[in-house]
Amino acid sequence: MLTKAFLSPAEIEERIAQEAASDKDRKLTPEQIEAIYSNGTNILVSASAGSGKTFVMVERILDMIGRGVGIDQLFISTFTVKAAGELKERLEKRLTKHLGQAETDEERAFLSDQIAKIGTADIGTMDAFTQKLVNQYGYLLGVSPTFRIMTDLAEQTLMKNEVYADLFNDYMQGKDAQLFQKLVRNFTGHSKTSKAFRDLVYDIYSFSQATADPEKWLCQNLLKGQIEAKPEQAKNELLDGLKDGLLADFLAFLRDHLGIAQREFAKAKYLNNVSDAIILLEGSLINDQTDMEDLLKQLLTLSGGTGLTNMTRPKDEELKAYKEAYNKTKNEFVAQLREVDTQLTVLEVLTKHNDDILPMLELLQSFVLDFSDQYLQAKIQENTFEFSDIAHFAIRILEENPEVAVSYRDRYHEVMVDEYQDNSHTQERMLELLSNGHNRFMVGDIKQSIYRFRQADPQIFNDKFQLFLENPDAGKLILLKENFRSQSEVLDATNGVFSHLMDQEIGDILYDKTHMLVAGSQKQKEPHPENETEVLIYNSDESSTSEDEEGPDQAISSGEISLVIKEIIKLHEQGVRFEDITLLAPNRNTYLDLMVSFEEHGIPLVPDEYKSSYLESLEVMIMLDTLRAINNPLNDYALVALLRSPMFNFNEDDLTRIAVQADKGQFYDKLLAAHTKSGLHPEVVMQGLEAKLTLFTETLADWRDYSKCHSIYDLIWKIYNDRFYYDYVGGLPRAEQRQANLYALALRANAYEKTGFKGLSRFIGMIDKIIASGNDLEEVTDLVPKNAVSLMTIHKSKGLEFKYVFVLQMNRKFIGHSKDGLSGKYIINREKGLGIKYLADLKDQINTNLPKLNVVLETLTFQDNRREERRASISEEMRLLYVAMTRAEKKLYLVGKGSKETLTQQYGTDVENNRLPVALRDQIATYQDWIMALDTAFMRKDLKFTVRFVEDEELTPEAIGQVEVKAAVDADDLSNNRQTEEIERALTVLESVEKLNHLYAPAIDLPSVRTPSQLKTFYEPIMDTEGVDIMDKKEGVQPLETASTFELPDFGQKTKVTGAAVGSATHELMQRLTLSDTVTLQDLTQALSRVSASDQVKARVQLEKLLGFFDTELGKLILANRDKLRREAPFAMLAEDPASKEDFVVRGIIDGYLLLEDRIVLFDYKTDHFTHPSELKTRYQGQMSLYAKALSQAYQMEKVDKYLILLGGKDLEVVEV
């Protein structure tokens, strides 16, 4: 076996010196070398943005392999499946290269072995690993290895609801029913359902599942805050803090003011109250026996109304400003005093009710524990689990079975984890159990921890960072701060912002020289003044923005969009390609507005994984309502939608004239009355409306008759043909997408009827059930332009880099500051547990005749949790801004909206430790306000960005401009036109036509669909299950008129069984076959009985071969992953003709495929006769490649394994293509 010693610290230092002395263009940094070669201890690599952490990981793995460590001796956890695939691909390429350079047979054999093992090595997500572990050792917990992962949210919700309903009824009728009703009412209020209480239970359950031991957390932490809460003690602490804090500051303020006011406002009446307040405060601060509550009430009485307000009217401008400043500060102090008074009242009430709250929450704790247990039992019974269940099973296996844990610890030379800052406590516990205590390698950057919503806890990284920093014996801390991605203008702006914003208080890390970004190469340091970071703010009147438009989900304004479009057009005119520009949005709510505006200006824009609702797309909704109206014209909503649609164009005036034809009844009856002029007001049915009604009633009647004896597929195409609807949407924005959606509707109707279900009513019922359940059908993948501006969320951009970056909606309010941010009835915290708002009945405390006097009180735990949650939320927003800013390579734009007058005068120049004060950073609600506060408090040269307000006058259509789309042929080019006589002009035209015909011959031969009729002619054979249909350019467009042929009826003749019929029957059987752990001959026979084929055809289907298929490796894989199986899946995609560069349509039906985490397994049944499998492998190579390409595009997954299942030979064969 290949073995080489690892480098010692001295050898690592020597290598660092050698690298520094080398003449390489791009040298490894000393920290990178340390990260690659250090060994023998736990290592934490804090890698700043663009510092090459993936490169370091790959090099470290290769170095270990080069020293004899097998790839199967490494545990490598990645954050996503995609990251794992990319890492495997890099390793395979590098190892293959090393294999070619190997000098000995032993080294070659070892490297070949490692390449072969990459596919099965433990490189992947923690979810994938825990599934593998539970598959192997689940029997120790009684878990069957054939378990299924429940990924469908609807399925999870259904099972949860069933368990919850039974448990809820038990508690409502149990011994603590009265207390339980009080508990439920505390969260549901006057609601007639228990949904709010159910949501609380589900939230607590979900939160507990992100901990390493859910049951332990529920028992020990859920009520920890409430148990430790001492309202009386909190009240005393609040009063004690008044003396040295608020009251002392108020006294100093009043003293300072009185000295000036007695001179400038000597006769002002309010000064007597100021003097009294000073006397009160001086006496109380000296006397330790002062009743602080009484003092507070006296001060509030003195300040009531205009008691302490300066009401004078000085003429001097300086005195006027001084007066206003005094009143403003005084009001702030009084507001704080009132807030303290309110808190004291709440604490007093909480003290009286504290003994009532805990028993109620203990009952809640019991309910959640019972729910967790019963929900798990329900999943065990169905042998289907969530990812969190599998993770906890894995932890239990390793904790309760030391021999299993030891086997893993002995196997792994090193336990590596990428994106360590986004680890959850469950994942951290798994890593601890797999490690031997000194062989962990962790890579991450706390400044990029942005996944709290997935229960990631950046404190895990932070604790390790502090531990290794303070105690090197515990582990080695390596900082990678050199950035190899961005130009100095981007790095300087990022450092300028975060060195004044981020610290341990907000951001969870002190952004000092240790963490500042440093240019990794000389080229990055070259100055480019034109690329200085710009803060672009659309100057708008804040009064025009309502509160409802503000918040984390607020829409982007048209002014911001216009501003961005103008800058992009400007960049484009300077030679910047669209594909080098990226827009980063806080969420996907802005996508549609941006797409529409960009399309209007001719700028191609590709949103990343933008998922619009297929069933809610306008063209599909209109077609569904058309089908509903055909099925039942008495459906008023569907009928009116069809009338208003572009197919018939009835306007509101038309509908009103129809509606008045009867006082009551269905709209269809009124429509018929209007058509026959037999309604209440026939005189209002004018000639134009009469023509519309005639067309509509005749068309609808024709469609209804047609639907009775034709398939839904044919009906849909008839609608497209009759009313030219397919052509109509082809002229709208996003035409290709709309037409693809309509085409897919016909395909799905056909696929639905092929399952054996017939009839328009059933199809509509199926669609309505999908809509009612909140689910959707996948939207058809659109053609994506190559040179286009990209649009994605900040979260999605993490780990990526782009030349020019626009960060949008800098004025969006943070969740913690928004109206609905933290205003719920409960907040859950990992340490303190559940904090609630308590519904207290104060009838006994207040003299009232009311039967009840309910008041909602925030418990101490709720207040504590809200403070922590708010601070944690703001810290993550700060890190999210860091991620956004560090994506740019060349230039960064920060785009927002606001009033110039307000933003430039809102903040002062106060600074603490070269940063904005903590209180101000905590109070600020948007990225934009952070930037503007920095701009006010610090010198512009320290910040390295410029702020520019853009006015409406700068955003006129003329000022914005338009992207010039160059035509392929300039029709107005008359340079070679002889222009003298008519004959010469005619010859010129003919010559031009001939040239164009020759130039575009391939495109002319390639059919282009011009009408729905022609389109249908091409699409008719789409459901052929044995192949892929391509609009072949050799076929051309068939003429509409074809010669009619009539064949004599085949009376009494014996039907000949064709191979195609047997093939179709075989495909249908495999589609109808119900899969379980094993497949028997009886299962196949039952499935065959349901096949819609003649008995002669069924007799030719070879069931023994099909049964044998499930004993093959592929058959076993399908049975083991049947929940990931897709059968008879229709597809349609656009491909480019290599000769003409024009698009043509490829479409077909895929027999089946498995959608696994790391790959797709595609398979196709073939009943063709063959003597050697290679014949069919060659024949269907192209077809399978097209299938694979379609699946790869649809699921964004590169690896597709392709198999042919050959049934036409002597024996069954499974061939990999």
From Swiss-Prot:
<dbReference type="GO" id="GO:0003690">
    <property type="term" value="F:double-stranded DNA binding"/>
</dbReference>
<feature type="domain" description="UvrD-like helicase C-terminal">
    <location>
        <begin position="515"/>
        <end position="799"/>
    </location>
</feature>
<dbReference type="Pfam" id="PF13361">
    <property type="entry name" value="UvrD_C"/>
</dbReference>
<comment type="similarity">
    <text>Belongs to the helicase family. AddA subfamily.</text>
</comment>
<keyword id="KW-0067">ATP-binding</keyword>
<keyword id="KW-0540">Nuclease</keyword>
<dbReference type="GO" id="GO:0016887">
    <property type="term" value="F:ATP hydrolysis activity"/>
</dbReference>
<dbReference type="GO" id="GO:0000724">
    <property type="term" value="P:double-strand break repair via homologous recombination"/>
</dbReference>
<dbReference type="Pfam" id="PF00580">
    <property type="entry name" value="UvrD-helicase"/>
</dbReference>
<keyword id="KW-0378">Hydrolase</keyword>
<dbReference type="GO" id="GO:0043138">
    <property type="term" value="F:3'-5' DNA helicase activity"/>
</dbReference>
<keyword id="KW-0547">Nucleotide-binding</keyword>
<dbReference type="GO" id="GO:0033202">
    <property type="term" value="C:DNA helicase complex"/>
</dbReference>
<feature type="domain" description="UvrD-like helicase ATP-binding">
    <location>
        <begin position="26"/>
        <end position="487"/>
    </location>
</feature>
<comment type="subunit">
    <text>Heterodimer of AddA and AddB/RexB.</text>
</comment>
<dbReference type="InterPro" id="IPR011335">
    <property type="entry name" value="Restrct_endonuc-II-like"/>
</dbReference>
<dbReference type="GO" id="GO:0005524">
    <property type="term" value="F:ATP binding"/>
</dbReference>
<dbReference type="InterPro" id="IPR038726">
    <property type="entry name" value="PDDEXK_AddAB-type"/>
</dbReference>
<protein>
    <recommendedName>
        <fullName>ATP-dependent helicase/nuclease subunit A</fullName>
        <ecNumber>3.1.-.-</ecNumber>
        <ecNumber>5.6.2.4</ecNumber>
    </recommendedName>
</protein>
<keyword id="KW-0413">Isomerase</keyword>
<dbReference type="InterPro" id="IPR027417">
    <property type="entry name" value="P-loop_NTPase"/>
</dbReference>
<keyword id="KW-0227">DNA damage</keyword>
<dbReference type="Pfam" id="PF12705">
    <property type="entry name" value="PDDEXK_1"/>
</dbReference>
<keyword id="KW-0269">Exonuclease</keyword>
<dbReference type="InterPro" id="IPR014017">
    <property type="entry name" value="DNA_helicase_UvrD-like_C"/>
</dbReference>
<dbReference type="InterPro" id="IPR000212">
    <property type="entry name" value="DNA_helicase_UvrD/REP"/>
</dbReference>
<keyword id="KW-0238">DNA-binding</keyword>
<dbReference type="GO" id="GO:0008408">
    <property type="term" value="F:3'-5' exonuclease activity"/>
</dbReference>
<dbReference type="InterPro" id="IPR014152">
    <property type="entry name" value="AddA"/>
</dbReference>
<keyword id="KW-0234">DNA repair</keyword>
<comment type="function">
    <text>The heterodimer acts as both an ATP-dependent DNA helicase and an ATP-dependent, dual-direction single-stranded exonuclease. Recognizes the chi site generating a DNA molecule suitable for the initiation of homologous recombination. The AddA nuclease domain is required for chi fragment generation; this subunit has the helicase and 3' -&gt; 5' nuclease activities.</text>
</comment>
<dbReference type="InterPro" id="IPR011604">
    <property type="entry name" value="PDDEXK-like_dom_sf"/>
</dbReference>
<dbReference type="GO" id="GO:0005829">
    <property type="term" value="C:cytosol"/>
</dbReference>
<keyword id="KW-0347">Helicase</keyword>
<feature type="binding site">
    <location>
        <begin position="47"/>
        <end position="54"/>
    </location>
    <ligand>
        <name>ATP</name>
    </ligand>
</feature>
<dbReference type="InterPro" id="IPR014016">
    <property type="entry name" value="UvrD-like_ATP-bd"/>
</dbReference>
